[in-house]
Structure formats: C-alpha cells, structure tokens
A protein has these predicted regions:
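Asparagine-centered strand-capping/turn motif at beta-strand->loop junctions
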Residues: 96-98
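Catalytic core of non-heme Fe(II) oxygenases with the double-stranded beta-helix
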Residues: 21, 25, 33-34, 44-53, ...
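Short acidic-glycine-tyrosine-enriched beta hairpin
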Residues: 73-90
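A short, N-terminal "cap"/entry segment at the start of jelly-roll beta-barrel domains
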Residues: 1-35, 116-138
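Short, conserved beta-strand element in jelly-roll/cupin
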Residues: 40-44, 53-69, 108-110
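A short hydrophobic beta-strand segment most commonly corresponding to one strand
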Residues: 38, 86, 100-119
Length: 138
C-alpha cells in the first residue's frame, strides 16, 4: 500500500535529528488549554532523533513505515503501523526510521506544563546500527 499522508507534511526539523525529519504541529497548545501537544513526524530512511526525555512523558502512535524506539540501556523495539509506545516521564530514549524505510508517527506530549523535551546527545551511528541490526523489514 503506498504511503497516503493523513496530514500535510510539516516543516523540516532543524535540530535534534540525524537525517531529514518533518514535523507538523497539529495541536501546538500555545495557550496551555489542553496541557498537551500533538504532532505528526515523518522520518526519512535512516533518520532518528537525539536521545531525549520528556518531563510529562510521551506517547507515540505509529501510522506508517518501519521505525525503532529505544530506551537507554534496553534493546530497541521495532515499530510498524498500529503500534503504540507509552514512554514514562524522564525516560531517556530515541526513535526514528529503519535504515531503508521511512517512518511516521503521531507524537503526544502530555503534561506540557511540566516543560518541554530535554535534548541530550545524538544517537551515534554505532548505536543506531546496533539498534537496527540490519533487520529484515518485511
């Protein structure tokens, strides 16, 4: 099935990513009314974000492609359409696309009154290679 975007492709992320990613803020919640942000992120093949934490946690709703999620010190989890990832507050993690496939998710950052993401070091090429392990993406 060809990729049929649900939301328009967002702006290219300028920082905190290795590779090309596009972010469309669906619910920026600038006023704080909802105490959460909702965003659509498209990762081009091989793209991943830096290690980071969220003071209020994060939820990922995987909508297209093949991706990976990894918590610091844990094995990576392969993600595909329909997967849901619940990330507790302050858990250091990264997520991104498979080496040869794009990946899209809806991200939800709850409890935004606690603050935004804390961005840490980039995921190294070695960490990424070990996490994705040349897996077959069928």
């Amino acid at each position: 099935m060809p990729n049929q975007e649900v939301f328009p492709k967002g702006s290219q992320a300028a920082a905190n990513f290795t590779g090309a990613a596009f972010v469309n803020m669906l619910v920026p919640d600038v006023s704080g009314t909802y105490n959460c942000q909702v965003y659509d992120v498209i990762f081009e093949p091989g793209c991943r974000n830096d290690w980071h934490t969220h003071p209020g946690g994060q939820i990922l709703l995987c909508t297209d492609g093949i991706g990976y999620y990894q918590e610091k010190g844990q094995p990576a989890r392969r993600l595909q359409r329909g997967d849901v990832v619940e990330i507790p507050p302050q858990v250091e993690h990264w997520h991104g696309a498979a080496p040869d496939r794009s990946f899209t998710h809806i991200g939800i950052s709850p409890n935004t009154r606690k603050g935004g993401a804390t961005w840490l070091l980039p995921v190294t090429d070695e960490e990424y290679k070990q996490a994705t392990g040349g897996n077959n993406h069928v």
